[in-house]
Amino acid sequence: MTSPGSPQRIVFIDVDGTILEHGSVIAPSTISAIRSARRAGHLVYLCTGRSAADIHPDVRAIGFDGIISNGGAFGVRLDAAGGEEQVLAHLMPRELVDRMISYFEDGGIHYFLQTDDGVYASPGIGAMADEFFRQRRERHAEDLRALGMDDDEAPLPVIAYRPLSEADLGQVVKSTFISTDSASLDRAQADLGDAFHVIPGSIPLPGGSNGEIATLGVNKGSAIVEVLDLLGLPAADAVGIGDSWNDVEMFEAVGTAVAMGGADPELQAKADLVTTGVLDDGVHNALVRLGLV
């Protein structure tokens, strides 16, 4: 747990399933709690698997001291004027990018490639992604009703991705794959695990599976270690808040790990404490419980 009496602590907070519910809805208490923690002198960094270009503008508008993106491949420090200073960057070696793409193509697996500036989709992924986003729109409306809001108060943004042909393969840091085969994740872990970090994805696909692939050793936890070293802060005074399997290394790198109420029970078991759900003031309740608000 975090050491008592520290004048300043740092919070690393996931986006999807932690700040955002189903891609676009933010509990008002989350916004006020993060801003209150920063006003109290604590640092708050986003720590997300998304590329920087894919972070919802409403999330950015909350205000943060820095961003770890692409699952730990990139990190920036933010200033009060909105300027960014890049503090870490770990590109996937080109030979690994080629190996990963060949694996997908040979196996008939649909995928997205991530760079710092965007997301690129393989041909044929459109229909599967469109169905996922249709389901997300339905859940978005349900989330708004749960908060007493109308649909037009927080419209769902258009999900934008570019064709694979436009990707600079020398700038790739991560991929997300989608398959109708429920065994594809296990196979990818077995076939690629010698050089890649392969973890379950978060896209709900009945009858299929999906995952995220990054360079072995590049993850949220490794990025947090770099940021803490840069800032001269001890891990004991760091807090990590998340909900999915790409948060495991974050939990291991911080002094206090907080799992969201909707997280997988196995992930909750790895946390120091479990807060409530995203729309049930989960982030706010965690920061209050830790004395940061």
Q: Where do the model's predicted regions map?
A:
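Active-site phosphate-binding/coordination module
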Residues: 25-139
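Conserved acidic, metal-coordinating active-site core of Asp-based
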Residues: 114-239
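Non-catalytic pre-domain segments flanking phosphatase-related domains
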Residues: 1-15, 32, 39
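Short, acidic loop-to-helix structural element flanking the phosphoryl-transfer center
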Residues: 24-40, 90-97, 155-161, 218-229, ...
